Amino acid sequence: MEIGIYTFGETRVDPLTGRQQGAEERVAHLLEEIEVADRVGLDVFGIGEHHRPDFAVSAPAVVLAAAAARTKNIRLTSAVTVLSSSDPVRVFQDFATLDLISGGRAEIMAGRGSFTESFPLFGQDLDAYDEIFSEKLELLLQLRESYRSWQEYIC
């Protein structure tokens, strides 16, 4: 059995002061949380992707790359990468790079997303929700299974 933690990186309100936590502060605390999770021996830490002002993380791969530099063993995953409003090639490349930085500890958890605010931001048609996700997931899986060497294209 594996044990891990995931977060959406939501910013919090201090119950004593009523002060809203800023994104910079939340991400700093998030990186500290990942370090502690690694030290105590948890197996995986996941960060969700959101494109709303009440969440601090819109690019999980970037935050996970910072965490990779500060940890040794814990696997690092998105929870989830909103594939419906993302370019699957870019997602694959970002996480392949994270996998290199982390020494093979990166994972992608792809999903549709539970909030639909990101669709108009990225020019997606909400009426094609299911078709968009299916097509992009198929491409992401093809990228994972296909070895590409660009060496033959170097002049």
Feature-to-residue mapping (PLM):
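Structural detector of well-ordered beta-strand residues that form the stable sheet scaffold
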Residues: 4, 77, 107-109
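Active-site oxyanion-binding pockets that recognize sulfate/phosphate
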Residues: 19-20, 27, 81, 123-126
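Internal, glycine-rich beta/alpha segment that forms the wall or movable "lid"
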Residues: 16, 87-155
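Outer membrane beta-barrel
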Residues: 73-80, 91-95
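N-terminal beta1-alpha1-beta2 module of alpha/beta enzyme domains
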Residues: 1-75
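Short, surface-exposed linear patches
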Residues: 24-29, 66-70, 85, 98-100, ...
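Glycine-rich "substrate-gating" loop/helix at the edge of Rossmann-like oxidoreductase active sites
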Residues: 53-56, 81-87, 125-126
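Active-site beta-loop-alpha junctions enriched in small/polar residues
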Residues: 8-10, 50-52, 81-83, 111-115
